Regions:
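Arg/Lys-rich, intrinsically disordered low-complexity tails that mediate electrostatic binding
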Residues: 1-20
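Glycine-rich beta-alpha loop segments
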Residues: 20, 24-117
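Solvent-exposed alpha-helices and their adjacent loops that cap or buttress functional pockets
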Residues: 51-54, 83, 108, 125-129, ...
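Glycine/threonine-rich flexible loop motifs
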Residues: 70-73, 165-169
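Acidic/glycine-enriched connector segments
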Residues: 75, 98-159, 163-164
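Short, solvent-exposed amphipathic alpha-helical segments in soluble enzyme
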Residues: 77-78, 108, 171-175, 202-205
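Short, acidic/small-residue loops that bind anionic groups at enzyme active sites
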Residues: 113-121, 158, 165, 172-200, ...
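C-terminal functional extensions of proteins
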Residues: 196-239
Length: 239
């Protein structure tokens, strides 16, 4: 009997498909598999739904954890949060020290609800400043998602470092890409003769826009303010 010749194409049909096994980067997921990490993220979102489900949207304040009372950034933040609280909006903040604590104090002084969205870090778990509710997160992403969701009236950025910059740029990009509702993104300059954010705006205008990677009309919702009165005016104009 003649053996039937099988073409390479035909023989490929009879081969068992091999499933590739992908190893998750356990180091980046704290030793968890991809499925375990996904479930952990989902649990944090469910916790937010249970804890803050009936809490109205408000104004999110962000800034450095490294400032202390007596620092003009800290002191002006208290005044700003108080003024915003008097408008009747809940204040959402990170629950940590520094600018986050100042936001909580201002919220309490203005009689508004203070909601702490805390991140578990190596240091002792502690909520800084007065607060009515607190939610603890194990990961950055669900915390940022919650700030984005509940800070839908406006988001105020006081001076901060890499974390604050990440939150600010992430929010701006989400709004630009229509992944989040438009709201004012406000950068607050607490000290008139020592600008903190102006350099960022100069870079966007004189470098990024000049080479065509951004247009002014892409970010009409981004503001820079230099006083509490200006901050209140921007928020009132949008609501």
């Amino acid at each position: 009997n003649k053996k039937k010749k099988v073409s390479k194409m035909d023989s490929g049909k009879h081969k068992r498909s091999r499933k590739r096994k992908f190893k998750s980067n356990s180091a980046s997921n704290n030793g968890l598999s991809s499925n375990q990490f996904g479930r952990r993220i989902a649990r944090q979102h469910k916790l937010v739904a249970r804890t803050l489900g009936r809490t109205p949207p408000g104004i999110a304040f962000m800034g450095s954890a490294r400032t202390r009372p007596g620092n003009p950034y800290y002191d002006v933040n208290i005044e700003a949060a108080k003024a915003v609280a008097l408008l009747g909006f809940p204040i959402y903040h990170g629950g940590g020290p520094g600018q986050m604590e100042a936001s909580a104090i201002g919220a309490a002084q203005g009689g508004a609800k203070s909601v702490a969205l805390c991140l578990r870090l190596a240091r002792k778990e502690e909520v800084f400043g007065p607060h009515d509710q607190a939610v603890w997160f194990d990961d950055f992403s669900p915390r940022v998602d919650t700030l984005r969701r509940f800070g839908s009236i406006a988001m105020v950025f006081f001076p901060g470092g890499i974390g604050t910059m990440h939150e600010a740029m992430s929010m701006i990009d989400n709004i630009m890409q229509k992944k989040a509702p438009v709201r004012p993104i406000i950068f607050f300059e607490p000290v008139a003769d020592k600008p903190y954010w102006q350099g960022l705006f100069d870079w966007l205008k004189n470098v990024v826009m000049v080479v065509g990677l951004l247009k002014a009309e892409d970010i009409p919702f981004v503001h820079i303010v230099r006083s509490v009165d200006e901050l209140v005016a921007v928020i009132k104009a949008q609501n």
